[in-house]
């Protein structure tokens, strides 16, 4: 546990020490990694792991993130995937000065089952959020109206809010029935209302599977909330990861417009991974977008569920 001891000692420059750890899918090791913990994001000061070397464990290759599709560039792909999986550097609700309340980050999530293991004694069953819950201090801080007086703010690494990506302010909360909800706040107040209206209309249309949103009040703000659709046996794979994991064919590359290329390659990627009903889902989603006048459709705000 050399890294843990080093990371916990205050006053030392722990960020320069090479550490060795394993990317896990539940209790399956999928990649051996070496690298450093760095404050790698431009605007927010979130320590993240950046790999210098990544080695795929062949016997568990099928459990890798879909995004990591090539052994030749596995280190580059891991770092890109990892950066997409955590807080966006465009988030405006992240405190400028932080006092971390726990030892080191495993980067568990409520949308997949990947995590960083530092020691072979660490077990998925003891640490994952689905079974063990999580502290709410990190999410409380993101939504507080008093960030300027939090100097420093106290946050936990071991929180699903650290791996809630995207630009909107968001947090996870678990109710008394142990059901997890994602709560989102928008800067202009319009987005959360749009999500609730879209839920009403899509329910009436009944043509495509969708995530239902409702309104709630969180820390004096009108927010939208949705139930977690990922379970202990599934993970969410963004369409962008499926899209980027398949090489472009010459035929698609020669299409005239970018929307044509994007659509054609996405459908080709869905067929490559043999996603049941995937192409039909995309077509119906695009029809619903036209009805809703949704011009914000992109490959990171929809996706597919994978059994794990």
Name each model feature, range by range:
Residues 298:
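Canonical protein kinase catalytic loop motif
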């Amino acid at each position: 546990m050399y890294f843990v001891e080093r990371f916990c000692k205050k006053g030392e420059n722990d960020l320069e020490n090479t550490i060795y750890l394993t990317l896990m899918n539940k209790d399956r090791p999928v990649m051996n990694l070496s690298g450093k913990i760095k404050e790698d994001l431009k605007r927010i000061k979130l320590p993240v792991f950046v790999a210098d070397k990544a080695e795929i464990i062949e016997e568990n290759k099928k459990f890798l993130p879909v995004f990591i599709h090539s052994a030749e560039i596995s280190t580059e792909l891991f770092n890109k995937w990892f950066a997409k999986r955590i807080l966006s550097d465009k988030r405006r609700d992240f405190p400028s000065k932080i006092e971390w309340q726990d030892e080191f980050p495993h980067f568990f999530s409520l949308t997949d089952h990947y995590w960083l293991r530092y020691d072979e004694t660490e077990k998925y069953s003891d640490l994952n959020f689905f079974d063990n819950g999580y502290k709410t201090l990190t999410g409380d801080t993101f939504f507080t109206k008093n960030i300027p007086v939090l100097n420093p703010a106290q946050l936990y690494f071991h929180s699903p809010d650290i791996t809630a990506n995207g630009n909107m302010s968001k947090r996870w909360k678990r109710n008394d029935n142990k059901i997890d909800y994602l709560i989102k706040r928008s800067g202009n107040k319009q987005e959360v209302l749009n999500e609730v209206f879209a839920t009403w209309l899509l329910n009436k249309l009944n043509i495509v599977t969708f995530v239902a949103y409702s309104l709630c009040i969180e820390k004096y703000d009108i927010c939208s909330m949705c139930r977690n659709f990922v379970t202990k046996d599934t993970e969410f794979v963004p369409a962008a990861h499926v899209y980027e994991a398949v090489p472009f064919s010459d035929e698609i590359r020669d299409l005239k417009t970018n929307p044509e290329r994007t659509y054609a390659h996405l459908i080709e990627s869905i067929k490559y991974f043999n996603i049941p009903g995937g192409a039909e889902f995309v077509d119906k989603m695009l029809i619903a977008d036209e009805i809703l006048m949704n011009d914000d459709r992109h490959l990171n705000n929809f996706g597919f569920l994978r059994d794990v």
